[in-house]
Amino acid sequence: MLLKKGLFLASLLTIAPAAFAATTWPLTIENCGVKQTFTQPPQRVVTVGQHETELLLALGLEKTIAATSVWFGKLPAPLVDAGKNLSRLADNSPSFEAVAGQKPELVLAQYHWH
């Protein structure tokens, strides 16, 4: 058991530098076969899903959230202050026009349907 824990820890220490490497710009990502290149971190993000909103809040990126939607409950206690001024497009599915009207540089959606 001790050997397994030691190997696991050694593996983590080996890959940790890559996991925490700084992002370089421009950054190209591919999603669903479509490539998108960002020359800088997106400053206007719309989240379609509470999970995505919580991730951005946990990363300290609340100022980048232009608007949010699709909420299922209250924010976890550690995120309440960061999320208190968020603009909600809808508690459920927002319209395409509502999302596009925010002029987002990035839309994060929890389901492919959105």
Regions found by a protein language model. Give the residues of each.
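A short, structured surface patch at a secondary-structure boundary
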Residues: 44-113
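Bacterial Sec-exported substrate-binding components of ABC uptake systems
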Residues: 2-7, 12, 19-53
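Alpha-helical transmembrane segments and their juxtamembrane interfaces
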Residues: 14-15, 74
